[in-house]
Regions:
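Interhelical loop and adjacent transmembrane-helix boundary motif
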Residues: 51-58, 210-221
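Periplasmic/extracellular loop-to-transmembrane helix junction in inner-membrane transport proteins
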Residues: 1-18, 34-74, 95
Length: 221
């Protein structure tokens, strides 16, 4: 009986290892194919020049600069707003239907297609607020797109911190704000940063919001 259990356990572990190695192998195969096919055409001129001949040749410098600007702008918007929202929901908001409703709405926002955010950003930032097709409009739109993930990650990171640390800090005379700033946030910050990186990784690959709010193919002269 024991040998049978060990056998089934070893088979299960072997399958898990095989599946894990298969996933890693596929990932490395894709990366290897991309590097093999691209190493011959990627050079310094390709990375530092603008596209030419109707986007059929030239370089990708505007795309690189635009991506970094959009990521920085969206992080500047999503990080403080998302972290403060997560702190409020976990540390200050009374437990009740209001918080549950906000959580449901936040989860629903995470599932909205990016094209909806793009249309919303075009209507609000580009047209109504008259930002035009700009980095600012695109950054705010991508910030809204990444906001639900940052909020949920912040809330879950703060939930994982034991209440004994909060109680110990308060027992030493610290205020609630001091406890959050000096005890809770430093402990939860690694997970919060991880959530922000995941959110930025998601929005960096979105095309619909960029197309509707800030699509540009050349750097300003």
């Amino acid at each position: 009986m024991i040998n049978r259990k060990h056998l089934s356990q070893n088979i299960a572990f072997g399958l898990f290892r095989l599946l894990s190695l298969s996933v890693v192998g596929i990932l490395f195969a894709i990366l290897g194919f991309i590097i093999y096919k691209g190493v011959g055409v990627i050079d310094w001129e390709f990375l530092t020049s603008a596209p030419t001949d109707g986007m059929t040749s030239g370089g990708i410098l505007p795309a690189i600069v635009g991506t970094f600007c959009l990521m920085a702008g969206s992080a500047l918007f999503a990080f403080p707003v998302g972290v403060m929202s997560g702190i409020y929901m976990n540390e200050y908001a009374p437990k009740g239907w209001v918080v549950r409703f906000i959580r449901i709405m936040t989860n629903n926002l995470s599932g909205i297609p990016s094209i909806v955010f793009g249309l919303f950003g075009m209507a609000l930032f580009v047209n109504y607020m008259d930002f035009g097709d700009s980095i600012l409009a695109g950054s705010l739109t991508l910030g809204l797109l990444s906001l639900p993930l940052v909020i949920r990650t912040t809330e879950e990171a703060l939930k994982a911190i034991p209440d004994s640390l909060r109680e110990g800090s308060r027992a030493l005379g610290a205020t609630k704000l001091q406890t959050i700033w000096h005890v809770i946030l430093p402990m939860g910050m690694p997970n919060i940063i991880t959530g922000l990186i995941l959110a930025l990784g998601r929005v960096s690959g979105e095309t619909a919001p960029i197309l509707f709010t800030c699509a540009a193919y050349f750097l300003p002269q």
